[in-house]
């Protein structure tokens, strides 16, 4: 029988570990770690300038309603149906120039409306000259690729637009058949579309008119650089190119020079920053009580929409099981799940069937999750850029939000680096009273043991299934 979480009340009284002694332990441990291990690389330097060939425009309102753009009626009807009323800054800055046929480099965070900023001009152009393989949109993750396809499908619903999503983890033959149906819009991860360009007979992008690189900084962070180089060599040089990124780094500037021609740069935000309406804090915890503090926080924010970020797939899976055993409605999201499992988790969280999403950094950027109340950093991220993207999942579209980071004695170096980039110290939230925490710890310890057992059983069953399948094939 699943244990019901005890309702824990927040208090400023005695904590599990005295804050001063814990801080001293943290400092000692950090000095020890500094001698023993190399420091994690700093995030790539952000550059404030672009090449002389680019034209900078400010993010002031270029138009006030979509009806001012003289779009085709079918596209306008879809825009109205989707309730796009007032353009976002990136849409206002980019769309007019894109409709003039100019290359665009857009600097904007996830959730700024940038998908529509490139989809609307492409669909307007496609209406005037419909042909297959018209546009290729490259995305760093499968989830983002599916969401971009959904936006194209919704905006192109009255135009007869055919789109396809080409990502890893799906059957190559099925995808080849989809490509042979000659879709107008291809949304893909770089590695998989390159596989098809090299191996799928009859498929080429010689007639491509538009290339979009979305979340380009992340494409490069995830080592898609070589695949991007190959793609740029096999597509027409005479094309329109849009590059969207959260930040302007040296790598992005280099990619811009290699792929764009006299682009217009629209910068909504190109610095490390968090939203003004985001309340950020941290809790000093001892490593052995980390799960207990997590459950305490899930109790505190009962009924809220919560994303918990962990560092590894194993932590994500185990923390999800722990939360479920203790009666919480939680779903996992990480790279070792199948595509259908990942989409299933996302849909449950977005629809409210589960109010807790426990995830690796795959959920930090690019996912369309409309309303998140709280972000909990169960594991401190390894760089400040990842921290800013994680906490940026809440306090969006003018709403307020809360983020809490659990900091152990092993996290000080990373934590101090994050504070340095933020430019201020995160306030410390008080721990619950010692007796309440210890009582909760007993339940959490028991549930943790059960979660570990279930994880082990699952892996053993999966290994046995693989062995049985192999034996059947050999017979």
UniProtKB/Swiss-Prot annotation:
It holds the Pfam family Helicase_C. PANTHER family: ATP-DEPENDENT RNA HELICASE, ATP-DEPENDENT RNA HELICASE RHLE-RELATED. GO terms for biological process: maturation of SSU-rRNA from tricistronic rRNA transcript (SSU-rRNA, 5.8S rRNA, LSU-rRNA). The gene is RRP3. ATP binds at residues 108-115. GO terms for cellular component: cytosol; nucleolus; small-subunit processome. Belongs to the DEAD box helicase family. DDX47/RRP3 subfamily. SUPFAM superfamilies: P-loop containing nucleoside triphosphate hydrolases. The Q motif is unique to and characteristic of the DEAD box family of RNA helicases and controls ATP binding and hydrolysis. Keywords: ATP-binding, Helicase, Hydrolase, Nucleotide-binding, Nucleus, Ribosome biogenesis, RNA-binding, rRNA processing. InterPro entries: DDX47/Rrp3_DEADc (IPR044765), DEAD/DEAH_box_helicase_dom (IPR011545), DEAD_box_RNA_helicase (IPR050079), Helicase_ATP-bd (IPR014001), Helicase_C-like (IPR001650), P-loop_NTPase (IPR027417), RNA-helicase_DEAD-box_CS (IPR000629), RNA_helicase_DEAD_Q_motif (IPR014014). Required for pre-ribosomal RNA processing. Involved in the maturation of the 35S-pre-rRNA and to its cleavage to mature 18S rRNA. Its EC number is 3.6.4.-. This is ATP-dependent rRNA helicase RRP3. Residues 48-59 have a biased composition (Polar residues). It comes from Meyerozyma guilliermondii (strain ATCC 6260 / CBS 566 / DSM 6381 / JCM 1539 / NBRC 10279 / NRRL Y-324) (Yeast).
């Amino acid at each position: 029988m699943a244990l019901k979480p005890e309702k824990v009340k927040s208090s400023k009284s005695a904590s599990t570990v005295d804050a001063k002694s814990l801080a001293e332990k943290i400092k000692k441990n950090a000095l020890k770690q500094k001698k023993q291990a190399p420091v994690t690389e700093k995030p790539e330097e952000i550059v404030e300038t672009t090449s002389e060939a680019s034209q900078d425009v400010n993010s002031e309102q270029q138009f006030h309603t979509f009806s001012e753009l003289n779009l085709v009626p079918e596209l306008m009807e879809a825009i109205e149906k989707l309730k796009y009323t007032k353009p976002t800054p990136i849409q206002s800055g980019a769309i007019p120039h894109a409709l003039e046929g100019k290359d665009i480099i857009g600097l904007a965070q996830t959730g700024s409306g940038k998908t529509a900023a490139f989809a609307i001009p492409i669909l307007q152009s496609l209406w005037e000259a419909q042909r297959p393989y018209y546009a290729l949109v490259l995305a760093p993750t499968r989830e983002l690729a599916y969401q971009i396809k959904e936006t194209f499908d919704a905006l192109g619903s009255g135009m007869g637009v055919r789109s396809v999503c080409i990502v890893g983890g799906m059957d190559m033959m099925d995808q080849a058949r989809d490509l042979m149906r000659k879709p107008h819009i291809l949304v893909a991860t770089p590695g998989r579309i390159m596989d098809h360009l090299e191996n799928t007979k009859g498929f080429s992008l010689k007639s491509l008119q538009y290339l979009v690189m979305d979340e380009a900084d992340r494409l490069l962070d995830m080592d898609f650089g070589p695949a991007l180089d190959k793609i740029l060599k096999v597509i027409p040089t005479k094309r329109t190119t849009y590059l969207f990124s959260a930040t302007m780094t040296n790598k992005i500037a280099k990619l811009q020079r290699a792929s764009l021609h006299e682009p217009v740069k629209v910068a909504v935000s190109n610095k490390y920053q968090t939203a003004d309406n985001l309340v950020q804090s941290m809790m000093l915890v001892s490593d052995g009580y980390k799960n207990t503090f997590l459950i305490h926080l899930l109790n505190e924010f009962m009924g809220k929409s919560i994303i918990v970020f962990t560092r590894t797939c194993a932590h994500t899976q185990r923390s999800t099981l722990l939360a479920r055993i203790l009666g919480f409605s939680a779903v996992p999201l990480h790279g070792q799940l199948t595509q259908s499992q990942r989409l299933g988790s996302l849909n449950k969280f977005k629809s409210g069937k589960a109010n807790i999403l426990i995830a690796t950094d795959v959920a930090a950027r690019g996912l369309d999750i409309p309303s998140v109340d709280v972000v909990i950093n169960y594991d401190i991220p390894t760089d400040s850029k990842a921290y800013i993207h994680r906490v940026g999942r809440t306090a969006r579209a003018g709403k307020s939000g809360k983020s809490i980071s659990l900091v152990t004695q092993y996290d000080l170096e990373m934590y101090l680096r994050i504070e340095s980039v933020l430019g201020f110290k995160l306030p410390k939230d008080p721990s619950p009273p010692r007796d309440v925490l210890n009582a909760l710890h007993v339940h959490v310890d028991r549930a943790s043991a059960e979660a570990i057992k279930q994880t082990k059983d699952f892996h053993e069953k999966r290994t046995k299934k693989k062995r049985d399948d192999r034996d059947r094939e050999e017979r």
